[in-house]
């Protein structure tokens, strides 16, 4: 029994995304540049929303949560991949694999729920503008964000506990650059019916955000069609444009990665899909909201025109208890 437990806690081997050739050295450098852009963009978005009082609204609070999720998502995957590449090692501990598995599932699920909440925010803003302060105030926004985090955490904790409880056999080589569940589950020795059932249930639950987003935009489209002013229509499309773009990128990448027939899946396609939604999408999200959103762009210009350090100190003093 002791030997079995020791074996189950042995390290996993990650195949990685790169090898030691010059071409892959260039690709690694490119990936790190994209990673730095993602970290910088999402961090900037979070700081702007915290610093600028005009962005202290439920809509931008939810946007800050999206940026935080993207920042954590890309860091969870890329930092370990970069460490292994630079050190020449390919191993990841059992606890490290379980942690990475939990975090990427949690952050992915939370982002799905949060995008649905953000679509509801757009629906209230366009279809019920006079009741927006009641239906979508700061307390409601905070509660929805907490529920997104909590629901995704419980779901991913169940997944992680079930998957990592199984015995693993063979060389324990994960044919991926991080501990994604389709790659890890292939190493399991034994019946995985319980885990497959859990995956099916979670998939059905994660279809709920898609339904809520679609329903919200059906009502939004109806309201926009009934608008007589072309200016109002442009404002409505501007309000929804960034969110729709992010939704399309995120769910499109997820569908490509997880909802294709197994007969059509290859290791290369799986890696490409994972790179897109775990690296490219978090990078594009911050750029989309920064470049397309006029309020965020104006906040950036305001911050650049004043002493940022002074503003940060003033904000910090407001939070610190008075002595």
From Swiss-Prot:
Keywords (A to Z) from UniProt: Cell membrane, Disulfide bond, G-protein coupled receptor, Glycoprotein, Membrane, Olfaction, Receptor, Sensory transduction, Transducer, Transmembrane, Transmembrane helix
InterPro entries attached to this UniProt entry: GPCR_Rhodpsn (IPR000276), GPCR_Rhodpsn_7TM (IPR017452), Olfact_rcpt (IPR000725)
UniProt topological domain (Extracellular) ranges: 1-25, 80-100, 159-195, 259-271
Pfam families, A to Z: 7tm_4
Disulfide cysteine pairs (residue numbers): 97-189
GO biological process terms, semicolon-separated: detection of chemical stimulus involved in sensory perception of smell
Transmembrane segments: 26-49, 58-79, 101-120, 140-158, 196-218, 236-258, 272-291
Localisation: Cell membrane
Cytoplasmic topological segments: 50-57, 121-139, 219-235, 292-323
Membrane topology term: Multi-pass membrane protein
GO molecular function, one term: G protein-coupled receptor activity
Family indicated by similarity: Belongs to the G-protein coupled receptor 1 family.
Function: Odorant receptor.
Protein name: Olfactory receptor 2AE1
Species in which this protein is naturally found: Homo sapiens (Human)
Gene transcribed to yield this protein: OR2AE1
């Amino acid at each position: 029994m002791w030997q079995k437990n020791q074996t189950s806690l042995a390290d996993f081997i990650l195949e990685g995304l790169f090898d030691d050739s010059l071409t892959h050295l260039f690709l690694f450098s490119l990936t790190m540049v994209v990673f730095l852009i993602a970290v910088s963009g999402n961090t900037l978005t979070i700081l702007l929303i915290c610093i600028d009082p005009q962005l202290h609204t439920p809509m931008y609070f939810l946007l800050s949560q999206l940026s935080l999720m993207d920042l954590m998502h890309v860091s969870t995957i890329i930092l370990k991949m970069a460490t292994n590449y630079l050190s020449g090692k390919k191993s990841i501990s059992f606890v490290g694999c379980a942690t990475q598995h939990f975090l990427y599932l949690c952050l992915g699920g939370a982002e799905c729920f949060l995008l649905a909440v953000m679509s509801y925010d757009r629906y209230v803003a366009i279809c019920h503008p006079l009741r927006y302060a009641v239906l979508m105030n700061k307390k409601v926004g905070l509660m929805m964000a907490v529920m997104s985090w909590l629901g995704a955490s419980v779901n991913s904790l169940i997944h992680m506990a079930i998957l990592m409880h199984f015995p693993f056999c063979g060389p324990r080589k994960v044919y991926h650059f991080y501990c994604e569940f389709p790659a890890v589950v292939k190493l399991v020795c034994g019946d995985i019916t319980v885990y497959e059932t859990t995956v099916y249930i979670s998939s059905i639950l994660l279809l709920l955000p898609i339904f809520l987003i679609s329903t919200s935009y059906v009502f939004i489209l109806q309201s926009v069609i009934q608008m007589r002013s072309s200016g109002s229509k442009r404002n409505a499309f501007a309000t929804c444009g960034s969110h729709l773009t992010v939704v399309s990128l995120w769910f499109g990448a997820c569908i490509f990665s997880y909802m294709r027939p197994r007969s059509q899946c290859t290791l290369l396609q799986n890696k490409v899909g994972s790179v897109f939604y775990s690296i490219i999408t978090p990078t594009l999200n911050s750029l989309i909201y920064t470049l397309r959103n006029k309020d965020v762009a104006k906040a950036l210009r305001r911050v650049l025109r004043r002493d940022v350090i002074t503003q940060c100190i003033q904000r910090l003093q407001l939070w610190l208890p008075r002595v």
